[in-house]
């Protein structure tokens, strides 16, 4: 029992040190990037897939990994208002502009909000009204609707990662996370670490 407690204490100590070391380079909200690096980098392939990437910098769960820890991967962002800035901020990363969804080769109506980080598939525009009312209000205050081609998470990994799951997958799609993951083949693709930001 004492050995387990010491091991847990050491892990926590090392994780806190990782946060201190990476300090100013951390872009994530709750240290997802540091934890992914801490968990994966010494044992597994340093590959990531982040979708809902916005500008690839602010609130990014993978910026630190790519730029300060030699990871590589792909970023998904369907909202055109972010594409120019995303390419500028992450010039060495593959950018996917299709909308990750349950199926590929469909078109979804996408709500491109003037409050860009809150953009989502139109059918999810009020998905967080009971839990994060301010988000729903801001999202729906001013926007435009556009049609965007879809790709499933399974097909995205098949195409961009040669059917080998990235070690870390970060999902932040403002409401559609569950539907996307419900159709994901967890038997075939086994990420080591998965973070899901949701509004429920």
Describe every region a protein language model picked out.
Residues 1-200:
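Phosphate/nucleotide-binding beta-alpha loop and adjacent structural elements of enzyme active sites
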């Amino acid at each position: 029992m004492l050995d387990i407690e010491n091991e847990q204490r050491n892990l926590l100590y090392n994780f806190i040190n990782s946060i201190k070391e990476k300090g100013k380079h951390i872009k994530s909200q709750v240290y997802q990037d540091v934890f992914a690096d801490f968990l994966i980098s010494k044992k597994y392939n340093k590959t990531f897939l982040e979708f809902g990437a916005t500008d690839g910098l602010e609130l990014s769960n993978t910026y630190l990994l790519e730029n300060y820890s030699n990871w590589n991967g792909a970023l998904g962002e369907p909202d055109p208002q972010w594409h120019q800035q995303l390419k500028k901020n992450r010039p060495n990363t593959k950018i996917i502009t299709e909308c990750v969804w349950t199926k590929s080769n469909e078109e979804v109506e996408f709500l491109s909000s003037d409050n860009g980080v809150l953009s989502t598939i139109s059918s999810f525009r009020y998905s967080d009204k009971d839990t994060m009312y301010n988000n729903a209000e801001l999202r729906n205050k001013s926007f435009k609707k556009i049609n965007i081609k879809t790709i499933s998470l399974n097909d995205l990994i098949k195409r961009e990662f040669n059917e080998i799951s990235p070690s870390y997958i970060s999902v932040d799609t403002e409401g559609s996370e569950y539907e996307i993951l419900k159709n994901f083949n967890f038997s075939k693709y086994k990420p080591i670490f998965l973070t899901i930001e949701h509004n429920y």
